[in-house]
Amino acid sequence: MLRLTTLLAALFLSSAVAAQPFKVCWSIYVGWMPWGYGAEQKIVDKWAKKYGIEIEVVQINDYIESINQYAVGQFDACTMTNMDALTIPAAGGVDSTALIVGDFSNGNDGLVLKGKSSIKDIKGQKVNLVELSVSHYLLARALESVGLKESDVKVVNTSDADMVAIYGNRDVTAATTWNPLLNEILSQPSSNLVFDSSQIPGEIMDLLIINTETLNKNPALGKALVGAWYEIMSIMSGSDKAATDARSAMATASGTDLAGYDAQLASTRMFFTPDAALELVNSDDLLSTMKKVAEFAHQHGLLGDAAADAEFIGISGPKGVYGNQKNIKLRFDATYMQLAADKKL
């Protein structure tokens, strides 16, 4: 009897140890709402159990704060853009991997002017945005398109959580932000969209970033997250009731209705299948895009004090490495998305 009790206790203990806990954080954005839905519908739990682990999915209202928490080790993975992955965790020395390339912004990020309709009218104005984020990058690309420089405007750092309310102030005349905030701002009187991310396709990617060391030690985490993601994608991308219900839930969670959420999806190049994501990840465009992003980051001092040039941090992809091969801190790894494409998860 004692042996049986000991055996059962050992089995229970081994089961408990096997269910290692991991934490993933996300913030509100059209391309990341599926994580909240997947957690609520227990899809993430299902895939975690399949691989003998536990995954807690946590929503954080402040986007930059979510990345900062990931960078200091509070979370194992976090949703963020390609630029922010480079300039926050990677630049801070945290070796990070793009586990999932979920989409690229195709109009979901934009520059809005109040009472003006041309980018050139922005000269001399204050521009509210999340400083040093992709909104700042978008502003730089917009200014570049009409021969202006950042010195022609004044950037006002504004949290995404406060953006809509602050834009309502009379003295605020320009803002760069992302959806759903962008659509809320555009609904206000005299607001004009003068530049958006559809004019720089593929340059603002939305990713699930994971700590590289954690992923290497726990491939089950990578498999569970990728498996859950593409199950959610298959549900929401259809035209049946299940798809409508899924997108309706995401719409409500992001503060809009189904029509509003579908409008945001229309300006997002969602990669609903792993094959679609792999097409970008395996392309020559990936590293050429990251070169532009790294150059912007270096010009703004975002790669750290030790960075002598834009190539200070190595960025690896299936086609090679941009930057310092001895200091790779951001990796685009197609391994797990390929497993999903091959139906081997």
Where are these regions (language model features)?
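Sec/Tat-exported extracytoplasmic proteins
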Residues: 48, 74, 79, 89-92, ...
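N-terminal signal peptide c-region/cleavage motif recognized by signal peptidases
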Residues: 13-16
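Soluble non-cytosolic domains of exported or imported proteins
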Residues: 61-64, 129-137, 161, 176, ...
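Conserved C-terminal helix/tail region of periplasmic/extracytoplasmic solute-binding proteins
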Residues: 293-345
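Secondary-structure end/capping motifs
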Residues: 218-306
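Short, glycine-/small- and polar/acidic-enriched structural segments
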Residues: 20-157, 166-169, 173-179, 202, ...
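Bacterial N-terminal signal peptides that target proteins for export
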Residues: 1-6
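Pocket-lining segment of extracytoplasmic ligand-binding domains
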Residues: 155, 162-258
